[in-house]
Amino acid sequence: MISRRDLLLQMAAFPFLATASQPRTPIKFDVPPGACDCHTHIFGDPKRFPMTPSRVYTPEPALVDEMRTLHRALHMDRVVIVQPSIYGTDNACTLEAVKQLGSRARAIAVIDVQTPGSDTMLADMDAAGVRGIRLNLETSGIADPAVGSQRVRAAIDRLRGSRWHIQMNTRLPMIDAIRAQVAGAPVRFVFDHFGGAQAPLGLDQPGFRSLLDLVRGGSAYVKISGAYRSSTQAPNFPDVTPFAKALVAANPQRVLWGTDWPHPDSATVAGRKNTDIAPLLQIDDGALLNQLAVWAPDAALRTRILVSNPAELYGF
């Protein structure tokens, strides 16, 4: 566990480290009332919210007040805070953030789906604003379809009969492998960040058709979020546009939008230990939100994506 003293020492040793990014580009369309940023994280004071020793990376802090500033600039009224991998199954930081933000916030938690848990625990978390659990196969380095399928099966069994959904951070080959499981599941699925599509590989890359089919059939939602994880063409990531438009065309009732703020650098970096500070990526969320008007030019479609879909899925 990294102590606050160690964190401050590391930050002092690297004075170029920036704080969580804020939008630099003004929003160029009318954001509808009730709009929701469906993908964010909070990284709290490490002394109060210790990170799991097995984490892949150590981010800089990103606090609730910084998120409030972000959302004022983006005209976002609602937010979904997703439990990051650095805390494992200790959801305290995420739940504290939801508590601070009140009824405008919901959470996605991480639980141990391999171990039977109590329904009371889920009920308590539901009352605190949790609406689903996350399977973060990507950050965990899980690419084996057999392992992924087993995790999905355990998660389905754990949530059977509840109103929660399963949110997955994975890549298209995994989605292709679990397509039948998702389509036949008694719970809803949400795939992060374009399902892990890589823009340079084009629309015909393996697995994207499976994602489209799941979205089209209503079995899964997809977040058109974190475009910089699919593309290197900053700041507008134009090569992501065909993917976003294809997903919106497939089923606009199953599309969500999110920033992925504060943009953690969770990738494995040669020579960087998991306890070394991984500077937050400096992403212009104003430019990213403006791209939604390119991906969904119709104002009614944007209202569906930003307001109606999140309200239905997260129970705002």
Language-model regions, residue ranges each:
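Alpha-helical scaffolding within the catalytic cores
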Residues: L63-E66, D90-C93, G117-T120, I175-D176, ...
